[in-house]
């Protein structure tokens, strides 16, 4: 039973700072600065009104969701065949290539900011969804190949052979047999990919100006402009947090099966 | 048929060349140039590299980074593994725990910084007030010690859930029969952990350790918002230093050289850990 | 080396929820000291659940488990001295074979010198000497399963060993060798054994007595011979034997003052004892006869009324015999009969069948009817 308390204690540790921010977002600045209250005594929605009345925020939301989704699509399409190749065939240099793919995840985004800017300027992609969605493949593609390879290796090769003997063509085998088998793996991969793309700031900030600005960037820029208005800042933080919470809540069952299939 | 693997790798290779390879070439190119605003770039060989390796600030940032990543690994991995073992295996508790654990992961990194900033600031935060009540004077903006452990606590708060999720997946894959056999064989909880849980989790733990190692090296936005790298430069890590060189500084060539050195260090450490972990516990036999 | 007794066991999964399922109901079973027993039944009949209740991995919802008369229901597996071999080889991968065998002894605080002695004994018996210091991951499922077995019987105080379909991962060709070594070990140490399987051949060759379960209930616990010759109900009759017993639905008529079984136009005599137990008001009756007991004749038996005309519909080669399926004329009842492999017979041929009365079982409402 004490194991449970250990978990609960940690979940409380997760929630306390979040609660403090949510609590603060409903307080006027006078209350925030003058006394320490565990719940808002002078409850107000003014902080939220200030943010939500701005066109920037709504656009930021939509931009973020679209970019992260595009990134998930790119990464999944490229990672599935690559992971299949690594899990099924031995070919010259496969181990080296696999590690080389992984090293891309170690690349510091800071190092790639300037080259990215130059490259995407030349391609005329700056301030479009494409730029960010492609740039985020830098750290998401290696991760996706890595995780999917694990899931695929867990599926015996005999299944492939049986399917081909039964007369399935390769596309038919993939669609009808293989993909359904690793669906939970795809779910976990897509979740992690989306997550890392959703929260990334540095590259997104470098590659967008106004039209394609994601929410993380909107947040930083509005902070810079408005100074440290704590109430508004907290409300902005809450707003930036909500989509993530909704996503985890929606996919929780998929995650539970994916993670309990247990091949990461 | 020999070309088949490469055909399958083609999309990934294309994507990597746009997102990594071409930029990396550019970085390499810059690293050997002296680029000053208003003048023509000229080739300066390894000059940039030497200058950085001799820079006190770089060495200090690297030292801090290594210590920080080390602390991250020795706290988050055992903590995450323990929490994963404490997770319910089925029932409504699973979904609830997953949702709560997923929240920190899906908060934009600068917002993580904001959450912890409002949580720990001496004028508006509840943490300093709580410490004050216990008689400890908490000062994130002036005490190096407080700043350090707060950044570490924030990282634990932010990233331990990822370790939990990965380990949880691994634990779920261990057949229940192993635990039944251990019970029948009168194994103590420690021996069950040592001979059942741990050997079966090796692959998963390699992933968790490498992922945390690589990502802890990249930590940037959170401490930037929380402490601004201070007090002084006591929480300025390698990534912060690198991006200061790459964007903040005038010398783009130097920034590029910093990035490459940084890149090299991470790959080296990851590779060593990868090899060590792969061979660990392998003495008695093969993999799985 | 103990007597295992389960008393009035009932086990319910997910009690009180929508998924509530009764896995085991009202099971009583006593395994005598030092005997080899099997637990046989179709998948999902509750075999594994019963096994786990005996080993202590599961707590029964109701009932008791007794070892040598002592109630151990509340005791954890470690205190029951019962070993279990699982469906697939459960091996501690990070230790070599020696370490695996030593594991339960070390956990019990046995001195190293004694451990070595025990391991030597077990290794001799199971022929594991050559691989004692190999890593189990390179050995393949057969040897690993033997190591798991060795780990089960290595403790001097092992009172019983339970097998949960241990041959699932073993190649058919090697099953015989493995089973031989298992059997030898059981005899050598005089261990009470319970072997769970859904393969009757495996059960009957391993065990002196076989318990058959169905839908969570124990149907019959008996020797192989009795199961074959005196099944308590139609399920056992059909389940044991390959092919199983012919079960022919029949009505009852009165002939010469005694009730007779009637299939279509054919009257069938059963043994006198059973005739006296029959009641004309019964419906839902079956007669049962083993395919090997059916007499087949191609020549017309003329006036012998014990023969029933039939038409062959199928002839199959099974093992060293031919199994022929024939339909009794003027009915849609099919009967299987076993004839020698060189018996000349073809499909669509008319034949005559005789059911010797002493070999016929009679079932009323699926239960066997015996002499009053």
Tell me the role of every PLM-derived stretch.
Chain C
Residues 27-38, 92:
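Pre-Walker A (P-loop) beta-loop-beta motif of ABC nucleotide-binding domains
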Residues 40-42:
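The feature captures the beta-strand-to-loop junction immediately N-terminal to the Walker
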Residues 55:
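Helix-to-loop junction immediately C-terminal to a conserved catalytic motif
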Residues 61-64, 215:
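Conserved coupling/switch loops of ABC nucleotide-binding domains, chiefly the family-specific signature
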Residues 63-71:
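Conserved ABC transporter NBD signature motif
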Residues 81, 91, 96-235:
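ABC ATPase nucleotide-binding domains
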Residues 255-372:
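Non-catalytic connector elements of ABC transporters
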